[in-house]
């Protein structure tokens, strides 16, 4: 029997669902199987097992006869580890189930390598990727209020000029970093002063991955378009709002 963390019989409220429900939530079958196998059985301190290891090591006689507790956090952790471990080709196939096809995207490897480090489910993986690929339709109000200041427009325009001069070299993270770090030092900026307004302009929020990665994935034309849009529209409106509040 599987109990909830309080020791009572597991119900749907606690996480007891149909297998397809887990699929729809973005869990990989290997992670779910690993989780179920470990509920009443162990092999020392090992937590993660390949299918081959499960077949080789699992012994029904070693199953614990007492009730086991459902731990949703453990399942999420296992799923995140499997997402990091499986091939990018496999992740591309999993994402198709959620209507995202990266098969022919020129930066699919970079997108997946970056996003799978943060995702606990395939649903989260999709969101992390689309946050980068989709042009933002709104901007995080709290982030704009905190990081967009009166001088933000000036140094973002300077930074855009720098990117344009080096636009042929923005194809990898190392080049973007090499171009950006001297700019930050020369203009007396702190990293959040530059990076957080850029994150907001490019993705709509402040919790996106590294700015270097995003720029290398999107390329100059898309980065320029999104930054210019943010400067002309949202950031200016925010300054007006703040001035009206003063």
Regions found by a protein language model. Name each.
Residues 171-234, 242:
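Charged substrate- and nucleic-acid-binding regions of tRNA-handling and nucleotidyl-transfer enzymes
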Residues 88-187:
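Small-residue-rich helix-loop
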Residues 19-20, 33, 76-79, 96, ...:
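Amphipathic alpha-helical segments within well-ordered protein domains
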Residues 85:
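Hard-cation-handling environments
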Residues 1-82, 196-202, 206, 229-230:
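Alpha-helical recognition segments enriched in aromatics with Gly/Pro capping
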Residues 5-8, 56-64, 102, 139-144, ...:
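Short, mixed-charge aromatic SLiMs
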Residues 239-246:
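Eukaryotic N-terminal low-complexity, Ser/Thr- and Lys/Arg-rich leader segments
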């Amino acid at each position: 029997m599987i109990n909830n963390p309080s020791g009572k019989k597991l119900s749907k409220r606690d996480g007891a669902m149909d297998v397809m429900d887990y699929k729809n939530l973005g869990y990989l079958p290997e992670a779910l199987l690993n989780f179920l196998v470990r509920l009443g059985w162990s092999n020392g301190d090992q937590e993660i097992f390949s299918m081959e290891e499960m077949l080789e090591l699992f012994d029904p006689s070693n199953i614990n006869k007492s009730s086991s507790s459902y731990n949703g956090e453990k399942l999420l952790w296992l799923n995140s580890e499997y997402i990091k471990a499986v091939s990018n080709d496999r992740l591309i196939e999993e994402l198709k189930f959620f209507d995202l096809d990266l098969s022919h995207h020129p930066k699919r490897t970079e997108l997946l390598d970056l996003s799978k480090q943060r995702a606990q489910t395939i649903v989260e993986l999709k969101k992390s990727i689309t946050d980068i690929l989709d042009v933002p339709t709104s901007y995080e109000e709290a982030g704009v209020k905190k990081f967009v200041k009166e001088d933000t427009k000036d140094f973002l325009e300077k930074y855009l000029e720098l990117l344009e001069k080096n636009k042929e070299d923005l194809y990898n993270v190392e080049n973007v970093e090499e171009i950006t770090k001297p700019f930050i030092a020369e203009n007396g900026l702190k990293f959040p002063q530059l990076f957080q307004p850029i994150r907001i302009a490019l993705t709509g929020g402040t919790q996106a991955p590294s700015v270097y990665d995003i720029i290398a994935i999107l390329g100059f034309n898309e980065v320029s378009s999104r930054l210019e849009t943010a400067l002309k529209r949202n950031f200016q409106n925010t300054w007006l709002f703040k001035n009206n509040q003063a």
